[in-house]
Amino acid sequence: MTRARHPIVMVGLCALMVGEAVWSMRNDLIPTLAHHAVVVLSAVVMVLVGELVRVHMPSGRVLAPISSAVGFTLVSLGAVQGSASFAVRPGVVILCYATGQVLAAALRREVDTTGGAAARLLSVGILVHLIRGVDVAGRTLWEWQLVSSTPRWVVAAALVCGASTALVIERLLTAMHRAHTLRTSTATALRDEFEEAPTVTFAGAAPGPIATLIAPVAGVLALPLALIPLVITMISVRRYTEVWRTLRQTIQTLSRLTEAGGYTPPDHAHRTAQLGRAMAQRMGLGEREVTALEYAALL
């Protein structure tokens, strides 16, 4: 199997999902968007910002937790103070989220080759069909949250479980693509994904329920307000990645001492480290073992 440069399968599934959304909304898409213009525009802008403000992990993973959190918020959003209740079909949520992603890609002027954007769109699409499309005792889960007799803690717990499930799907899809790209085993990629990514990823399960519960009082401002805990988590994770980046730069600098002294050919340590890393990935070693081997080769 040749190495894939683009997540073709996931992109194809995303294209089918967006196409189905457009087809299902072909008769009332414009009126629906106009009726919920404030919420839709706010969500698209926030998805755009979330796709641009990403977290680069030490292993090379690129995460966009704000983008995922905004998508999950759109899925569960109901009553909104000062605006009409966000009672829309699943296709509207999918199109809003995809629009924000496309605009972000256009501003970055680069195509996402990590599979992350496609995985996020697919996870949002799956969640919106579960929340807004599956009947439970005669009502969808989204309709149950509007029933005043439903305890708020039950609503919050259900929404957190739904968002967590979508995040697991996102990580699974990303791990499968990463395993194919790096030519390592899927089991190893899954293990590494759930060792490194959950710190910031699963913090994205909370903003959706928070925004949904406070939107009847706070209105559209509920969307950015609910993201504050996630933003704080992202800042902490970014500092963590900066420490690892500094460590890596220090080791790379030390590896050049033998070159400067004339004991090894130019870039010898770098070539050895890259070869060792590639072999370790082919053998199915985890990210920690691969990194340790790379650092040992550099030194």
Tell what function each PLM region has:
Residues 1-223, 233-237:
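Membrane-embedded alpha-helical hairpins and interfacial helices in multi-pass inner-membrane proteins
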